[in-house]
Amino acid sequence: VDAETSITIAGERDDYVSRGGHKLAGALDAFPSIVVEGRRALDAGASTGGFTDVLLKRNVGNVVAVDVGYGQMAWEIRNDPRVSVLDRTNVRHLTIEQIGDPVDLVVADLSFISLSLVLPALVSVTKTTADFLVMVKPQFEVGREKLGAGGVVRDPALRKSAVIEVAESAYDVGLGTLGITASPLPGPAGNVERHIRRSAGTPF
């Protein structure tokens, strides 16, 4: 190849530090009434920081990024002064003492645990006016015995029941459901994922 030749590598262009960013961006676009700018947010299951990246690009006030793992978050996200990272932290046992002031926006992308198990902890660290935008991954909601090949939930009825069960669990902790939207991207194995928007004091 000539030294003056420009080379373009074909592939998926990614505006965020992980593909998860596109999932949250799509959900926020589907619910334009959710205000991000200036708010204090919690990113549950932050991992490499895709969701946090979206919030930062939409001018969030600050983000508490929580993950049970360690050292996964992209360097440029971790070093943003608006981000507080809580590594090695199980969100199921999260307390207000760990994060300081309560948050008024919660986003979540959790794996290997049902959302129903973590919602009580999430509610305990939020303001009563908080918005919740959480991703339902059916493969972690329906039970291992109902998974198809490759860990994919192929039955639409099972995917629907996963969303309903999470919505009912949310109602039990005082959260109503305001809307449901499909993720613009499937999970890595092909699972159909959905975002549920919830808010305190909203009818089921």
Give short role names for the model-derived ranges:
Residues 1-30:
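S4-like RNA-binding module at protein N-termini
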